[in-house]
């Protein structure tokens, strides 16, 4: 039984391991709190709120304000398109995987964001975070072959409830494992948001740079795998893609 579980774990790429996703969703929580506390009181990790706000403005007849929300939505769409288009070309070069290249790009992106002055229009950072959050969401899709989001918690909450019922009803150990995996993701998201909120009180707009620590941990783990034990698997497509 132990050998079977070990073999199953070995089948996973480094970018599909649960701890990688836990760190990445902590980054997602960090971004969410950062834009809410520091950049205009909005959440930029997903688009549902933007469409609700656009609908509210349309209902009030504020056409110009409504049209603004097409900007973050378009940035999110663009992030998805780019992160769908580039992996094939990056992986074909067989130097590093797309996942690794993306984390390096994300580090550079938020490093640049840290230079945006605190008195600049918050929409600059909002749209920029929309873009990078979209790319992160689309790049990291499954951990341990379980569909996972790394920028928001809605599906994780649903999956906790669903798998809890399956576990209690039939004693399904796989459902129990999935439940705890989703709980870990929620906890990591909250931890990232708490840290971001605390740091914003001291560092202001520069707080975004602290996310570099988490991203660096992921980047070097993925890079080591790409250059080492997974170098002959650079053309293997992660589950969910």
Describe the predicted segments one by one.
Residues 2-241:
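Alpha-helical transmembrane segments of multi-pass membrane proteins
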